[in-house]
Design a protein with these regions (language model features):
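Short, glycine/polar-rich helix-capping loops at beta-to-alpha or helix-loop-helix junctions
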Residues: 53-61, 149-155, 176-177
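C-terminal hydrophobic helical "lid"/dimerization subdomain
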Residues: 128-131, 173-211
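Adenosine-nucleotide cofactor-binding segment
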Residues: 43-125
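Rossmann-fold dehydrogenase core element
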Residues: 136-143, 153-192
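Short helix-loop-beta connector
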Residues: 16-24, 111-113
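A glycine-rich, Thr/Ser-enriched phosphate-binding loop motif common to dinucleotide/cofactor-binding enzymes
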Residues: 1-15, 27-31, 37, 92-100
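Surface-exposed amphipathic alpha-helices with a cationic face
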Residues: 36-44
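Helix-to-beta-strand junctions that scaffold the AdoMet/dcAdoMet cofactor pocket
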Residues: 20, 134-135
């Protein structure tokens, strides 16, 4: 529920950049806690979720949740800090990788349509690409920095194409209720792997500790 409410606020809490029918939404970490909730929220709102995964064995899981397609980030190697804009060769290499990633989105959709919303939480290694592939007038919304906090931004993409970089943290009462309503209506699967009796509480803690 924690990650569900967080995801709901990211996708539905920042007007006018809320998920609308037909909107393309790029979801980083599609098979994780945040991502699995985001895919389902996007689908429930009539959007088209593209999940980014780290292993092929996560593809089926994301597709069953409602993703329109998946991109394996290991198929690309341009991640990390942006090269300096005066480093022509380095920047050209990065741009080639970012464009290839963007094309992978278009290939899934079958049209040249970029994400109106990019659902971010890796941070440092992915922010440059997220901003690049985000559609003109779209939003990159971020709630964490699981790969690091010192992200680099090419400001030209923000001002020339009117893109929004929005921070988001947890949820208020309205957003929590919005998520719980989707859960109660059966539109979202909480993705529980197991349920435990009170007596098995130590076992559940041990399993979480071991990831």
């Amino acid at each position: 529920v924690l990650v569900g409410a967080t995801a709901y606020r990211m996708l539905m809490g920042w007007d006018p950049h809320v998920v609308r029918p037909g909107d393309v939404v790029l979801v980083w970490g599609g098979a994780g806690g945040l991502g699995s909730m985001a895919i389902q929220i996007v689908k429930a709102m009539g959007g088209r979720a593209i999940a980014v995964i780290s292993d092929e064995d996560k593809r089926d899981f994301c597709m069953k949740l409602g993703a329109e397609g998946c991109i394996n980030r290991k198929d690309f190697d341009h991640w990390g800090m942006l090269p300096h804009w005066k480093d022509d060769a380095g920047y050209a290499d990065w741009l080639k990788g970012a464009r290839s990633f963007g094309k992978a989105i278009w290939d899934i959709l079958g049209e040249k349509k970029s994400p109106r919303i990019v659902f971010e939480h890796p941070g440092e290694t992915t922010i440059p690409t997220s901003i690049f592939v985000c559609d003109t007038g779209g939003m990159v919304v971020i709630c964490a920095g699981t790969t690091g906090y010192n992200a680099t931004v090419d400001l030209r993409y923000l001002w020339m194409r009117q893109k929004r970089l929005q921070g988001s943290h947890f949820a208020n009462d309205e957003h929590s209720k919005g998520y719980l309503d989707l859960l109660a209506s059966g539109k979202i699967d909480p993705c529980l792997s197991r349920t435990f009796s009170w007596e098995d509480l130590p076992v559940s803690h041990q399993l979480m500790y071991e990831n």
